[in-house]
């Protein structure tokens, strides 16, 4: 892996919202954002609500001095304490994305490590994520393990 050169990891600011939305859209459409789908309005509102809430959300970005090239999201989920999550505090790592032309430079690793450090700083018990096949190897290298319980969902 190449070293990150001239990239600066920083926290997203409110004015980064449009750029983050563009990056998040790439997760769902590798060809790039094409329309103002309904989720985008909700995502804008959600980001505006949580961008400055360091107790419940973390938005690291890689800034090379132009448009943002990479980002990730960490959000705190509080549930019932249990033997595997003694305080009931889980950070959900999501939307880890680097622009294709900037991949392989360590940006994603920096973002994940930043969210993990934030999770420790807020006394979370663990960090959970859903990995793509391409990303699984990277997460395993950073200490994440595959769980025995499959993720499931019910779309409402």
Enumerate the language-model features and the residues they cover.
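Conserved GNAT-fold acetyl-CoA-binding loop/helix
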Residues: 28-47
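Conserved acetyl-CoA pyrophosphate-binding loop and the N-cap/start of the following alpha-helix
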Residues: 102-114
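A short helix-loop-beta-strand connector motif used in the catalytic cores of GNAT acetyltransferases and
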Residues: 48-60, 92
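A conserved beta-strand-loop-helix scaffold within acyl/acetyltransferase catalytic domains
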Residues: 72-82, 86
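Conserved beta-strand in the GNAT
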Residues: 61, 67-76, 92, 97
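A short beta-loop-alpha structural element at the N-terminal edge
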Residues: 8-22
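Conserved catalytic-core motifs of GNAT/GCN5-like acyltransferases
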Residues: 79-82, 128-130, 140, 145-156
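Conserved GNAT acetyl-CoA-binding A-motif
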Residues: 112, 119-131
């Amino acid at each position: 892996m190449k070293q990150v050169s001239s990239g600066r990891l920083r926290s997203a600011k409110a004015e980064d919202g449009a750029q983050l939305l563009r990056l998040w859209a790439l997760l769902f459409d590798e060809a790039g954002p094409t329309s103002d789908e309904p989720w985008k309005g909700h995502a804008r509102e959600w980001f505006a609500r949580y961008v400055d809430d360091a107790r419940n959300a973390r938005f690291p970005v890689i800034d090379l001095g132009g448009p943002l090239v990479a980002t990730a999201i960490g959000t705190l989920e509080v549930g019932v304490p249990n033997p595997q999550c003694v305080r009931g505090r889980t950070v959900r790592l999501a939307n880890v994305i680097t622009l294709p032309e900037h991949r392989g430079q360590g940006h994603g690793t920096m973002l994940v490590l930043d969210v993990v450090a934030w999770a420790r700083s807020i006394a979370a018990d663990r960090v959970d994520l859903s990995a793509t096949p391409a990303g699984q190897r990277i997460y395993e290298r950073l200490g994440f393990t595959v769980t025995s319980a499959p993720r499931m969902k019910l779309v409402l």
